[in-house]
Amino acid sequence: MDYARRLPRMFDPFFDQLEDRDRIDGLMTTGTNVLTKNLFGRLRAEPLSTATTFNGNMELETEFLSLRLGIPNIHTAAVPGVKVSVGVLSSVPAADYQVWINPENNEWLDFTIDLPARLGEERPSITYIDVAALASVARTDVANGRTIIIYRIEFPANSVASMPMNNQYYWRGSRAPRVLRTSNQAVQGVTNKAAFTSQAAYAATKGGDDYAVVPVVQYQTLARGHQVMICGDSIQEGIGGDVRCYGAMERSVYELSTPERPLEYFNAALHAQGPDLYSRMLADHVATVRPTIVTYSPWSGNDVTAGSGISAAAMRRLKASLGRVFYTLQAAGLRPVVLFPEATPVNTGYRNVGANDQARRDFNANWLPKVSAGFVIKGYAAALTGGRDAAGQDQIKDGLTGDGVHPNDAGHDALKAVVKPYFQRLLDRVA
């Protein structure tokens, strides 16, 4: 409800808080015990001439009772006969270039699945194994460490695997936000466990950093937390400079997450794509992920034309795509909190739109706040915005971008400072 502003305007922030409280009452703010991890957005299809097994050690946010792995397929055809093994670990090797290749007590659980073709252009199918009767075990290498799983995924010869489009550099070592180490070997490492011997996460060619199948992991937790679904273009996917799918949204989630109050994310963002496509990615998977928080970018620079700026047709598409998001959530019976990042500037040297940049500023200031079904992340654009050129186009602040459009590491940190309070507020409401 709206509160009558009869008192001095100095009380406006207080009334704003009351109105926001009323808006989120009844939404999915009490959290969930089913979390789904998907670290990478856009995928590429990688042909395999020989049978190949992908091995990985992955950290989850909190203790779990059971789990299931989802294997993505971005190929235009089905991939039958994929074999999956999963187990648990109590540690990871001290050296970040190594991975374990066997679980605790050599206890593997094995599954075989057939992967249907992709759901559409740039939209992978995700096929889940049955629920694995595996519970997490305590870490022995670090005190109070998060739980670790191990997996193997075996693809048959002459099949196609789906891998992170931009690889997964910086997901191990001192800069890694969570443990993710992968290795691979051209053997049938699920069929014959002993055949897989590759413990090296790095190789000059086709090493674990650039040649990996990373599964989706859905796990049922003891602690209650929030499930975030991130949807947008490259900025939301989290790329720019050295960043590989770990941008402001992802950082906000993992920096706030604790084993006692976990936050997990499903990265459904797709770089180089627009709202018409990435809103469909959300529609493809939202019923399985069942997020309690959705971050959705209604505006994408990929729909903005150099010189003329955003067209009337593109504006209609982005509004219709936002409508698709709400239709999808309603059809799935979901009422997550939806957060809208504002549209960010682009340097003139990257895409010159001149005075037409006013359309973006008007979108942020006037149109987006009218969408009552979500909350605008206020200050998101300002966190990146520097000066304005003579033609009227805002520029990204010096030092916050390397290419004039994507935030670099410092740029994502600047955005993160604006995003985190929204997640923290919702995390505080977990029942």
Model-derived features: where do they sit?
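Conserved SGNH/GDSL esterase-like catalytic core that processes O-acyl groups on lipids
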Residues: I71, P116, P124, A132, ...
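N-terminal secretory targeting modules
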Residues: A4-L7, F11-C231, Q236-E237, G241, ...
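Active-site segments of SGNH/GDSL-like serine hydrolases
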Residues: S297-N302, F326-D362
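A short, gly/pro- and small-residue-rich
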Residues: Y170-R178, S308-T328
